[in-house]
């Protein structure tokens, strides 16, 4: 099986490590953010890439990547923890009154920084040369196919916050750090706000504002659409009311015609009664003549009612057609208005 070829890079110099620590403190709010989402992860990756660019600007010859500077920082943190544990063990061995609970905490790498750095002048945390004594595996960066994922659990937020606390030294040792002249930046992190180095938050805010504006416009259009729907329902209600009124009018007209018909029948009966009394001797022809007249009148009345019914049906059809045309024009007007608003900036 063919082995993977490994390419070793040179160790980080003192100047590169000091630049790395300074750039990390400038980006504290982003790198050690407790928020967990895609945007924050992207901002963290960009922050490490910017730190790598600052380290490369030192001009030591090696081109570092964001993953390499992040791994270097984790190795530096691990070395500081081991040195802190050794210092605590020395304090315990020399008779320093360290409580048992603090000793347990030191063994679990959670001891207080003030105890960890107390009375140990030889524990020079910024002495980057100590990395060479800690083993080459901490400083060698191997370019392989199986590279560690920067988003793996070893980069958890709690570990990164502890890492930051390891960077900040005791203020009483400020004058003992000649290799790190800008160490005062570590003291003022909590008292002075750091200068914003990213435009991403402003960009995100602008994107959110645009989203809110689009959502507001969409809600306005939805409200107008609901208003149009409400008006359409109101028009439909009015149309149904008119149809009911028309139905009632037709019913009244039918009753009126019924009354008219009854009246005509009574008139015929009253006019035919004397004729029947005076002409009892006439034949069958004279008796059937009034019945023929009545049948003819009923036929004419029926035809007139049918014509009236057809006329009303035609008017109803025309009314519905006009109503549909009105609604179509209203919908077309609304579509043109929405299209016009959609082209606005």
Swiss-Prot record:
Domain Myb-like residue range list: 4-77
Pfam families, per the entry: Myb_DNA-bind_5 (PF13873)
Residues with the Phosphoserine modification: 106
Region (Disordered): 141-175
Keyword annotations: Coiled coil, Isopeptide bond, Phosphoprotein, Ubl conjugation
GO cellular component, one term: nucleus
Modified residues (Phosphothreonine): 188
Coiled coil: 202-344
Cross-link (Glycyl lysine isopeptide (Lys-Gly) (interchain with G-Cter in SUMO2)): 9, 114, 142, 237, 254, 273
UniProt-recorded name of the protein: Myb/SANT-like DNA-binding domain-containing protein 4
Species: Rattus norvegicus
